């Protein structure tokens, strides 16, 4: 079952960020953070610095998208 991770870091341009992402392991959360920040701001992995990855409970999540994804019991593909 996936967990909710809060990924905290900054970029070499000085932008600080906190992302809430789903992942099985902390490595998965870091990869998702690299993907999201890189695509949104056109940055490479060397320009993104991850400072901390913390597991948080669904009640502590502020992202509505993450809360919704955690509430899904099953997915049916047609």
From Swiss-Prot:
One of its GO terms (biological process) is translation. The keyword Magnesium does not apply. Gene3D superfamilies: 3.10.20.10. One of its GO terms (molecular function) is structural constituent of ribosome. Keywords: Ribonucleoprotein, Ribosomal protein, RNA-binding, rRNA-binding. Pfam families: Ribosomal_L18A. It comes from the Archaea. One of its GO terms (cellular component) is ribonucleoprotein complex. Belongs to the eukaryotic ribosomal protein eL20 family. Part of the 50S ribosomal subunit. Binds 23S rRNA. NCBIfam families: PRK00773.1-1 (NF001981). HAMAP family: Ribosomal_eL20. This is Large ribosomal subunit protein eL20. It comes from Pyrobaculum aerophilum (strain ATCC 51768 / DSM 7523 / JCM 9630 / CIP 104966 / NBRC 100827 / IM2). The lineage of its organism: Archaea, Thermoproteota, Thermoprotei, Thermoproteales, Thermoproteaceae.
């Amino acid at each position: 079952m996936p967990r909710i991770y809060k990924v905290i870091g900054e970029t070499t341009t000085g932008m600080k960020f906190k992302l809430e992402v789903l992942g099985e392991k902390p490595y998965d959360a870091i990869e998702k953070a690299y993907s999201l920040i890189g695509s949104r701001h056109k940055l490479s992995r060397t320009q993104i610095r991850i400072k901390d990855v913390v597991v948080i409970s669904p009640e502590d999540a502020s992202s509505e998208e993450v809360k919704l994804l955690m509430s899904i019991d099953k997915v049916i593909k047609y």
